[in-house]
Amino acid sequence: MAYRESYAGKINRKLNKKLHVVEVASGRQKADLVLKNATYVNVFCNELSHGDIAVAEGLIAGMGEHYEGEVEIDMSGKLVLPGFVDAHIHLESALVSPKEFANAVIPHGTTTVITDPHEIANVMGTDGIEYMLQATEDLPVDVRFMLPSCVPATPLDESGAVLDYRAIDSFYEHNRVEGLAEMMNYVGVANADEQVLEKIVAAQAHHKKIDGHAPGLSGNDLNAYIAAGVYSDHECSTVEDAIAKLERGQYIMIREGTAARNLDALLPLLTPQYYTYCMFCTDDKHPNDLLEKGHIDYIVRRAIKAGVDPIIAVKCASHHAARYFLLNNRGAIAPGFLADFVVIDNFDDFNILEVYKKGKLMFDGKTVTPFDAPEIDPHLAKRSHETFHVAHLEATDFIESRPRAVLGMVPGEIVTTDAGYAEKISVEDDILKIAVIERHKNTHHIGIGYIKGYGLKSGAVATSISHDSHNIIVVGANEEDMAAAVNRVVELGGGIVVMDDGKVLGELQLQIAGIMSEAPLIEVNEALENAKEQAFKLGVSRGVDPFMTLSFMALTVIPTLRLTTRGVFDVINQRYV
């Protein structure tokens, strides 16, 4: 009986709101807010429309003339756009808490993001997913989730958890979970691997979306991948790859982030022939990029300056992602849609003047309206600060008795070459030692190799951001500083450390699972930029991002050589060398 009463109460509350919205829409009651004399993007007719926009209960009640509101704001001379949607991002890549991320992107017009929490899931397993769900509850940026499909990324990785479909299945019942995130194991899908396909089948059983990750996949393998139920991809770097997928019914997420930038290459898609199934995403967005360039607004601005029709750019930044994810109450300015607005001066300058979330002003052109961080279960908060299980290391732990393979770095890329073998560090020849230390289960596993092209002349650089399992990775010109740098990362509870002659020259603490900081974004960026500068002073090549590049050296899905906790792995030939 209690359930029936609770249900009846819920219906009554919703009915009262609906009555208010309908009364406002019909003009019989005043709106909560009216944007007067607005010129707005009509995503349905591909044109600019004009009139008042009436808001009630956080929804758009109507557009037209002569609406009255408790609050009325004149929009003459401005443009009103739907709130922006990032179709695919890993929030952890910003290195800050979800609250800090929201605070950073609101001024850029972002009102919804679709996140894949696979970074923290690789460290904390299902506790990591639950942590992120709690940390994003009721933020002024609506955070929706796609569940990680590949934890760990490959069987070679020693991650903090192994998640099969059973482990994540209950999360599909959460009202902000939209589906299964990027299916990186496209080989497993194409080869009909049952353990891979059961994850897709489980998501489909819950009527959820499955996102893709299949760079360069073509022919029958691509057919098999899509036939399995994967209907989007964000890994296209060429128009040819994208069109092959569009022809087969996939949506294309045009990515312009920090680690990968594909907008310029994919601009030909933003034409009437192809744009209908395209949307924008960032994938990874680092602090400096967020502060200096922005978020989805940066992609829209760039596209318009490149000659793309502004309405096409706006639709790819809002309506298309909402439609793909079946978020049918956002991404447009129309009756019944969420009152998520971005107000700009004009398409040419594209300065964001105001941002509204559910009809509430969240950015006034200068400051973000303050909001509280969500409460996180104390057990989860404590767990997120206790993710390092590593013994104290000595220089001797990095001494090896035989030649090891050399990872050859490629300028501006995260792929590597096979650069032969080395027996010792040779700073003169730019041969440095690199190691990956398992940090989740205290296995004492340390994989050792060499790397060429990093440029370090002295000291060591260590980080607990090491895709995708986030063990500790370190590069050094001597074993003593390598050990000291790793030990300092552990002392911090996670972070980035630049060490020379036993002294810390720069560091950034990442105490949330070893991959995110609790500090404000500006402070994180300052610490990160200082650490970068110290790494450059120690000789790291200026064309190399000292930490981002290093963080990908352990990802065993990218050719040619990678380093795991068990040694150097040849991705092409699928064997240790």
Each model region followed by its residue ranges:
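Active-site microenvironment of metallo-dependent hydrolases
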Residues: 1-51, 55-56, 65, 106-108, ...
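Divalent metal-coordination and catalytic microenvironments
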Residues: 38, 58, 77, 88, ...
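Short acidic, glycine/serine/threonine-rich loops at helix termini
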Residues: 65, 124-128, 154-160, 191-195, ...
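Active-site mouth loops of central-metabolism enzymes
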Residues: 86-97, 152-163, 231
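Active-site beta-loop-alpha junctions enriched in small/polar residues
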Residues: 90-94, 118-120, 148-153, 183-186, ...
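Histidine/acidic residue-rich metal-binding segments in metalloenzymes
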Residues: 162-182, 188-253, 260-280, 291-305, ...
